[in-house]
């Protein structure tokens, strides 16, 4: 009976949520209903695998935000593979630039409570605590940033404190506004809320801000930067154990799943790999 009551309560709550979002969409308060895939078995909108950025896309992204607030964040994602919470908690006392082989140590994590930043000295897993070598481009970027910084944080807000959730969203908006993704805004006209659509054209300047050029014809997420880093490690033939360590994966299964998708997602490479394996097999049988 208790179990039946719990199931009934879950269904009631689920239906309540679906009704709220359905009404919000019908009232044109939101554009998409995130609960349409919500079922009694759980789950939500099916997640699509985000592809790693190509070298060209990474270069275009960095060129588009050169000198802007998200630049250092993006560099740390692309060339150190840090998670968002690791980047926003990173302090200069964990970045070692004056050594023969510059590196950084991941020892803190960021999250927010009621939009206020909280920096934790305890990481979720032991694997998250790691030392990451810095490629020359990232080391140079951090040296320049540190020389002009008055904060103990590598990616701080204007006051030198860690970012709140809202401040991070604002930081990321510098990237979103430079994409050609279709976007919407609302205005009240004759007392009515009217939806307007903006369709950016690649290479053109934004009508509202001449400093903004629509230079990105692809979307980017913070996690995609990290995925690009891991993908590049694998394409550079870094062994799975080292990839696991640098990525901070607690489970080797996570690393191997990514490794398999990346390594064998190219038919030509798979054919060569299998051909080599069968050649060795034939030689052993001869």
Q: In which residue ranges do the predicted regions lie?
A:
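Single conserved hydrophobic/aromatic residue that forms the stacking wall/gate
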Residues: 1-8, 13
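Conserved hydrophobic/aromatic pocket- or pore-lining residues that grip, position, or stack substrates
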Residues: 17-20, 38, 61, 76, ...
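C-terminal flanking helix
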Residues: 18-21, 25, 263, 267
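Basic, Lys/Arg- and aromatic-enriched nucleic-acid-binding interface segment
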Residues: 26, 30-90, 100, 127-129, ...
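Conserved tyrosine-mediated DNA breakage-rejoining catalytic core shared by Y-recombinases
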Residues: 39-42, 90-145
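Catalytic-site neighborhood detector that most strongly recognizes the C-terminal catalytic loop/helix
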Residues: 44, 52, 139, 247-272
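Short, basic (Lys/Arg/His-rich) helix/loop patches that form interaction surfaces
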Residues: 63-67, 80, 132, 147-162, ...
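C-terminal secondary-structure termini that scaffold catalytic or DNA-interacting sites
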Residues: 99-100, 114-129, 136-138, 159, ...
